Amino acid sequence: MVQGPTTHRNLDDSPAGPLLILSPCAGTPTRVPAAPDAPDFRLPCHFGRPTRKRGPSTPPLSSPGKVCATGPRRVYSVTVCCGHCGKDLTFAVKTGSTTLLGFEHLLNSDLDLLCPRCESRERHGKR
C-alpha cells in the first residue's frame, strides 16, 4: 500500500495492519542523507546506526542519476519501529519504485528489524 505525504494523525494501539507511507525526497542528492528531514514511509520495525564496512572499500554499484531497470532511482526516508520494543527510527534508502515495493513486501512478511538495544540483548541472550 502506497500513500501520500506524512500526516500527524494519531493511530490506535492495534492497527489492522502495518502502516507504510512511501514518498521520494525533494531532490536526488549524490550521497544518501541521514534522512531526518525527508518524507518517509513507516513500517513495524526499527534500524540502528549504519555499520561501517571493514576491509577494502567498494565502488558504488551505479553512478548518481543512473536509470535502473525499475525506473529512476530516488532517495526515500524510511521510518520503522523495532520488531521487539516498538521504538521508531528513520534511515534512508536509494532505489527504484519497483524495488521499493519489493522491500515493502519483505518488511511486511518475513523481516523484523531491531533497534541497537534489542539487537544487543538478542546477541547476548537477554530478553
UniProtKB/Swiss-Prot annotation:
Residues 2-56 are annotated as: E7 terminal domain. It comes from the Viruses. GO terms for molecular function: DNA binding; DNA-binding transcription factor activity; protein domain specific binding; zinc ion binding. GO terms for biological process: DNA-templated transcription; symbiont-mediated perturbation of host cell cycle G1/S transition checkpoint; symbiont-mediated suppression of host innate immune response; symbiont-mediated suppression of host type I interferon-mediated signaling pathway. Its main location: host cell. Pfam families: E7. Residues 33-66 are annotated as: Disordered. A zinc finger (unnamed) spans 82-118. One of its GO terms (cellular component) is host cell nucleus. A motif (Nuclear export signal) lies at residues 100-108. Highly phosphorylated. Keywords: Activator, DNA-binding, Early protein, G1/S host cell cycle checkpoint dysregulation by virus, Host cytoplasm, Host nucleus, Host-virus interaction, Inhibition of host innate immune response by virus, Inhibition of host interferon signaling pathway by virus, Interferon antiviral system evasion, Metal-binding, Modulation of host cell cycle by virus, Oncogene, Transcription, Transcription regulation, Viral immunoevasion, Zinc, Zinc-finger. InterPro entries: Papilloma_E7. It is found in: Host cytoplasm; Host nucleus. Plays a role in viral genome replication by driving entry of quiescent cells into the cell cycle. Stimulation of progression from G1 to S phase allows the virus to efficiently use the cellular DNA replicating machinery to achieve viral genome replication. E7 protein has both transforming and trans-activating activities. Induces the disassembly of the E2F1 transcription factor from RB1, with subsequent transcriptional activation of E2F1-regulated S-phase genes. Interferes with host histone deacetylation mediated by HDAC1 and HDAC2, leading to transcription activation. Belongs to the papillomaviridae E7 protein family. Homodimer. Homooligomer. Interacts with host RB1; this interaction induces dissociation of RB1-E2F1 complex thereby disrupting RB1 activity. Interacts with host EP300; this interaction represses EP300 transcriptional activity. Interacts with protein E2; this interaction inhibits E7 oncogenic activity. Interacts with host TMEM173/STING; this interaction impairs the ability of TMEM173/STING to sense cytosolic DNA and promote the production of type I interferon (IFN-alpha and IFN-beta). The E7 terminal domain is an intrinsically disordered domain, whose flexibility and conformational transitions confer target adaptability to the oncoprotein. It allows adaptation to a variety of protein targets and exposes the PEST degradation sequence that regulates its turnover in the cell. This is Protein E7. It comes from Bos taurus papillomavirus 2. The gene is E7.
